[in-house]
Every structure is written in structure tokens, then in C-alpha cells.
Amino acid sequence: MAKTYKIAVIPGDGIGKEVTPWAQKALEKAAEGVADFEYENFDLGAERYLRDGAILPEDEEERIKANDAILLGAVGDPRIKAGILERGLLLKLRFDLDQYVNLRPSKLYKGVTSPLANPGDIDFVVVREGTEGLYCGAGGAVRRNTPQEVATEVSINTAYGVERVVRYAFKLAMKRKKHVTLVHKKNVLVNAGDMWQRIVDKVGEEYPEVTHDYQHIDAATIFLVSDPSRFDVILTDNLFGDILTDEAGSVVGGVGYSASGCINASDEFPSMFEPIHGSAPDIAGQNKANPTAAILSAAMLLEHLGFDDAAKKIHTAVEADIEELGSTVRSTDQVGKDILARM
Amino acid sequence: MAKTYKIAVIPGDGIGKEVTPWAQKALEKAAEGVADFEYENFDLGAERYLRDGAILPEDEEERIKANDAILLGAVGDPRIKAGILERGLLLKLRFDLDQYVNLRPSKLYKGVTSPLANPGDIDFVVVREGTEGLYCGAGGAVRRNTPQEVATEVSINTAYGVERVVRYAFKLAMKRKKHVTLVHKKNVLVNAGDMWQRIVDKVGEEYPEVTHDYQHIDAATIFLVSDPSRFDVILTDNLFGDILTDEAGSVVGGVGYSASGCINASDEFPSMFEPIHGSAPDIAGQNKANPTAAILSAAMLLEHLGFDDAAKKIHTAVEADIEELGSTVRSTDQVGKDILARM
Ligand SMILES: CC(C)[C@H](C(=O)O)[C@@H](O)C(=O)O
Ligand SMILES: CC(C)[C@H](C(=O)O)[C@@H](O)C(=O)O
């Protein structure tokens, strides 16, 4: 008998609400016969915040934690000051649920036009650290609003936090083309950069089949444009990973095809899967948003739960859909139906 | 009678030594009749360090300071641990000489092939803060080399430091298309980001003709690929500026055409002009390196000293050279001669 998994669903705002149902449908269809899903919906995001001021109430966070995984749509609204929802909801979940691997595949699908003239065969994964670095909210300001104001941001990096994500990257490389590229800025951020490099060298010795090299973040942004097919697994910190994955999304034809997983690889807390795109208030409510990235995030969820064959069904359907119909204008529902029909 | 300017020349390492003489020749030719130059050469960089361990001796730094401007080639050698020369020489000069504006124009020249399929008309300038942020070397580590290691990097940002570079950007925008885009990550780096935004808003009020908007660094890396012609003046901090200008260099066909100025806009200390590319040990000594970026850095030096017409001569010659011969393989000396012949 198929086991039932409990999934917390946070559709969020804008197009998040429109694409998430398609992620759920794809999940069910792909796992038919091998897994069942029971959903718990959470009304979190900008609309909730504007309505009653709540961002992530403690009891709701506890209930989220009791699930096997989380599906998130998108969160955000231009009416809310930058940082409030990001730090109070999205990053809070990543940190509290210790989702230390932020996994972001970039693939140029056949049928998608890259902005690059000669993109080559792009298929790499960014393994972004998710719980440290400049994202930990350390920092402050004195004499705010005066000419003497000083504002700081502190990047905190621990050997504990770095080593576990480095191990994840090498393990992942073993299943791929066996190459890891560490990206940092160790010629300037010498403390953190040196520690990352030492840990990569050490863990690398345990994986003699995996080659690894190093690039400064500035050089990496060049190669993502000039030679993106050189990459297999890119391993980097929280901020550099944020930057590189958006650039990568652009290079593979837009973040509309990019999903991501915020993974607690020790399974202590549920992992979270989301499209990389935002809530896109400009096209919200018009049945226009492309649900492909959300559907791909369902595939990542399935892989995380161990259902590789089910995930493969989604990938195959998405690839065929994009190749055949990627350039036609379709509604959210039409794309969702087309992909499901192929599964 | 033409005034004589004293120029400190730091050819540095690798191809730095090959391209810098062409920057000097272009400088002289362009300023013929309006300015003369007297050079003081400094033997600094990797080769000097490997020879006698000196990076930037105090007396040499004092002599550098006594010049009107600095021409730098490139510094670096793979035999030296990352950070030593960067922090001991390049960044030390930027900081000690208070070069708070790191000015980096990006232009797609006619005759250069961009890696983008539809690059459009790319012509923007990045105004990167040069003396603060994550570059100040604040940070450290405890329990180094143990599983309990913690490494920090601290970004220090002051209203004083931010306001002066913001003013520079708005003034520059008045001479261009009157648009400033602030790039930061204010939804995560809330202390520094909020201060940058407030200061931009405040200074912006003094320039009612200049419009300004904001982009997160991750979004900016997308637009540099998907729609780079939208930018006019990009204003950003030290680290984000480092990243964006390399990506921009790639988008305009390679850092070989990109020059930069580290500018002390209060003229208290000399400003420094350099090509964006590195010392390229792989092609050093082969008369292969393209001197165009170095020659363009001479044009920036001339503009800084107020010789706009002379600078224009260089720009016109470089543009014509690239349009006609940009795709032919030429030696360093041939490119140098060709450009000079047009001036
Ligand atoms: C919304 C923001 C906090 C977030 C981040 O910076 O991580 C986003 O850009 C992302 O990449 O998921
Ligand atoms: C060499 C390095 C310290 C430097 C920087 O990060 O500023 C370089 O990348 C640059 O952009 O000039």
C-alpha cells in the first residue's frame, strides 16, 4: 500500500496561488500508486500580513514542521517594505528548519531560447549554503538617519555549517559529471574564503574521483555568460549562491523554468520546494503565469522523498512539453493540463 | 605652455608589463600640446614580492602619493596565496588613497561580438563604492583548522562614505542619460541596504531631472543578460560592484575592452587607472595581450585631469580600430601602433 505523506502548502501571494495547485496535481499524478499526499494549507505571505499583521505565528510554524515536506509558491508584495516577509517568513523557515542545502538546478531545455548566442549544453546544479553567511541577520546600525550613521552586516560562517554542505555537493557530484567548482571571493574575504577552501580540499580527498576547482565570484559571473556548459556542480555560500542562480536562471531562458529546494539533508525538519520566480504582482490573477517551475519543484520534492521514478515522469513530461510547445503562448491552466496529459 | 603631470606607473605582473607602455604612449600622443607627463616607475607586484618579500613599502607608497595620478597594469601570480597582493597592494592603495569611486564603464563597441544573441545598445557606467563594505578587512576567525572554526567577514558602511559616492553617481548621470539604478540586497542586508536607499532618496531630491530606481543584486545579474541596454548609471557597493562589472565585461565581449578608474574625487590623493583584466600569466611575454583596455584607462586618466578633448581622441581612435580590425588577430604592439596611428 502506498504510504501517505503530509505536505505543508504555502501558496503565498500573486501567481504563487495560481501555480501551486499545478505542482500539487503533478505530484499526485507522478506518484500514483507509490505515494499519497495529504495537504495542510497555510495562509502566509503578504496578503495575510496586510490583513492581520501575522508573518509566521509560532503555532503555525510548529504545524509546518510536523509535515514531511513543504511546497511554497511565491511570497511578496510591493506594498510591503523590503525585508519584512523575506526575513520574517522565507528566511525564517530556511533557518529554523535548518535547510542548509539550497539546491538549484539550471538546465537549458530544448525549445527554450537562451539570451546567449551560443549557449552550448547547459546543465549544472548550484549547491548554495542556506543557513549562514550574510543571511544570518547579524549586523546593525548606529546613529541611524544622521550623517554619522554606520551600518554593518556580518557574515558568519562555521566549519560545521560549511562542511555539511560541502559533503552534500561532493556526494551529488558523484551522481553527475564528478566535478565541483567552489565559488567564493577568497582573495578579499580571506577568513571565510580560506575556511571554505580548506574544507573543500579536505572533503575532496575523500572523493578522489571528483575533481574540484575554484573561481572567484566575479570570474564565475563571466563564465556563466561566456561558457556556462563548463559547470557541473557549483558550490558556494548563501549570498553568492543567490546571485549566481538568478544569473543562471537568466542564461537558461528565464527563471520561469527554474525550481529550487531548501533542503534539510539530515531530515530533522521538512525540506521546502519552490519555483525560483517571485509573486509577479503585474501578471497575477490573469491565468498567465507559467506553472512549469512550480511543477519542477514538485519533482524535486519527489526526489527528496526518494521517488526518483516518479520525479523522472515529471521531468520527461516537462521536457517534452517545452520542446514541443515552449514557444507558444498558453494560459497557466493550459500549460498545467498539457504537462499532466503527458505524464 | 603645457603643464607637466607626474604619473606613478605600476606595470605590475605578466601582461601588465606589456600593455602599460601603450597606455603611456597613448597618453602622450593624446595630450600633445596640452599636457606633458613625467613618469615614476614602481616595481611592485608578484615578481617583486617573490624576489624580496616587499608588497608596498611605506616610502614607496609615500612617493606614489606625491604623483598626480597612477597608471596600473595588472597584479597577480598563481604562485602567491590569494589575498596577499590583493589586500596588501591593490586594495591598500584604494583604501589609503581614499579612492572612493570605482568607475567602470561598459560599452559594446561596434565590431565586438557580444556573447548575447540580442545585446542591444549597451553603454552604461558602474559607480562602485571603493573604500567600504566587505572590502575593509574587518572579520576574523576563531578555532581555525578545527571542526569548531567560526569565520566572519564584516561589511562596514558609513553615511559619510555612501553619500559621497551617491553624489558622484547623480552628478555623472546629469552628463549622461539621467538615470541611476541603485543595486543592493536590501531585503536581506537590511541595515546597509536601508541606509543606501535613504541616502539615494535624499540626494535624488537635489537632482529632480535624474530618475532613479532600485534593483536587488540578484535581479540586476538577470537584467545584465536579458536587457543590458536599460542601464545608464549603476550605483552599488564594493562587493556588488565587483561582481556586476565582471559580468558586464563579459556581456560587452570580454574584459579586454574594459578600463576602470579608482578615483579620489576630492583630489586629496592621486587617482588610479587600470584595465579590468588581470595579469594573465598564461599568455604573458608572448606579445599577445590586447592593450586596448590599458589604452582606455589612459583616456579615463585624461578625463580625470580635465582633458576631455584629449580623452576623446583616444576613444575615437579605439572605436575606429575595433570597428575595423577588432576581429583580426594582432600582436600587442600591432594593436598599440594601429590605435596610435589613428590619433
Ligand atoms: C527573497 C530573497 C530573500 C531570496 C534570497 O535572497 O535568498 C530570493 O532571492 C531567493 O533566491 O530565494
Ligand atoms: C583583485 C581584486 C581584489 C579586485 C576586487 O575585488 O576589487 C578585482 O576583482 C577588481 O575588480 O578590481
UniProtKB/Swiss-Prot annotation, chains A, B:
SMART domains: Iso_dh (SM01329). Keywords: Amino-acid biosynthesis, Branched-chain amino acid biosynthesis, Cytoplasm, Leucine biosynthesis, Magnesium, Manganese, Metal-binding, NAD, Oxidoreductase. Binds 1 Mg(2+) or Mn(2+) ion per subunit. Mg(2+) binds at D218, D242, D246. It holds the Pfam family Iso_dh. Pathway: Amino-acid biosynthesis; L-leucine biosynthesis; L-leucine from 3-methyl-2-oxobutanoate: step 3/4. This is 3-isopropylmalate dehydrogenase. One of its GO terms (cellular component) is cytoplasm. Its EC number is 1.1.1.85. Catalyzes the oxidation of 3-carboxy-2-hydroxy-4-methylpentanoate (3-isopropylmalate) to 3-carboxy-4-methyl-2-oxopentanoate. The product decarboxylates to 4-methyl-2 oxopentanoate. Substrate binds at R94, R104, R128, D218. It catalyses: (2R,3S)-3-isopropylmalate + NAD(+) = 4-methyl-2-oxopentanoate + CO2 + NADH. It comes from the Bacteria. NAD(+) binds at G278, S279, A280, P281, D282, I283, A284, G285, Q286, N287, K288, A289, N290.
